[in-house]
Design a protein with these regions (language model features):
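Mature extracytoplasmic enzyme cores
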Residues: 1, 234-245
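Membrane-helix boundary/interfacial segments in multi-pass membrane proteins
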Residues: 113-125, 156-196, 209, 243-249
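Hydrophobic alpha-helical membrane-interfacial segments at the cytosolic entry of transmembrane helices
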Residues: 6-33, 48-53, 156, 220-238
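Membrane-interface helix-loop-helix junctions at transmembrane boundaries of multi-pass membrane enzymes
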Residues: 2-12, 96-108, 134-164, 213-225
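Periplasmic/ER-lumenal interhelical loops and adjacent helix-loop junctions
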Residues: 27-138, 240-249
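Transmembrane alpha-helical segments
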Residues: 132-139, 197-209
Length: 249
């Protein structure tokens, strides 16, 4: 009963806070909504019949999912240049040019170093191998519902970022989640993972600082977390073709 009462109070506070926030910004929200009806994000008066990529209101499905994060591109959370990095000419990569044949400099100026699924990118979504290790460790040593909420939010953001590479899930959100069809560049939702992964990593670090003995008590989880991240990084270094069949060395 005590737990239920606390949950009810916390829920009520969240609802009241949300209502206050909405009421304070109601004018901006209303005018933005009103303006949106007259833009490409509003409902079109010209709707083609039997066209699968249209939404009932909002942007076109192909337009929304144009910048979809590749499934194998998700490894950039741990390894930043897993898909080549930013969409810039290979000639701008000084480290690569030191090993390249100078006779082909003009060709390198035409080749982009990014080879992922997106039309282009200014850089990968990167968290870091060490932070990922702490995140995995946090799944074992951190207690409480917050851990599972952060894990669920991380997985959800990754699945949504895949966009056209995971269309059944994307279609569900486009068809049934309000306002989702108003936004483009689904890969940008990985900003959630960029927040939740370090947050759980910090919670794990705090747990270790507060209870240093947990490192010896849960040593197998420490080894497992380190082994997973270090093992994958090592495989990337020596056998990238395992993860990317179309990889060209």
């Amino acid at each position: 009963k005590g737990e239920l009462a606390r949950f009810g109070k916390a829920t009520a506070v969240c609802v009241v806070g949300a209502l206050i926030g909405i009421s304070l910004n109601l004018s901006n929200l209303y005018h933005t909504w009103q303006y949106g009806q007259e833009t490409m994000r509003g409902k079109s008066e010209l709707v083609k019949k039997n066209v699968a990529n249209q939404t009932s209101s909002g942007l076109d499905r192909d337009y929304i999912t144009q910048w979809s994060y590749g499934i194998d591109e998700t490894w950039t959370l741990m390894i930043p240049d897993a898909k080549g990095g930013a969409s810039v000419p290979l000639a701008q990569n000084q480290q690569a040019m030191e090993k390249a044949d100078p006779n082909f400099v003009q060709i390198y100026q035409q080749l982009g170093q990014y080879w992922g699924n997106q039309p282009g990118t200014s850089g990968p979504v990167y968290v870091g191998a060490f932070v990922c290790m702490l995140f995995i460790l946090g799944l074992f040593i951190v207690k409480g519902p917050m851990k599972w909420a952060l894990l669920a939010a991380t997985i959800l953001s990754i699945l949504l970022a895949w966009g056209r590479n995971f269309m059944p899930f994307t279609n569900f959100f486009l068809d049934y989640v309000p306002m989702y069809a108003k936004f483009r560049t689904v890969a940008s939702i990985l900003v959630i993972a960029e927040f939740t992964i370090p947050l759980l990593a910090m919670m794990a670090l705090k747990k270790i600082v507060d209870e240093p003995e947990i490192l010896t008590e849960k040593i197998k989880y420490v080894y497992a977390s380190f082994g997973l991240t270090a093992g994958f990084c090592l495989l990337f270094a020596i056998m990238p073709g395992v993860f990317f069949p179309d990889f060209v060395s």
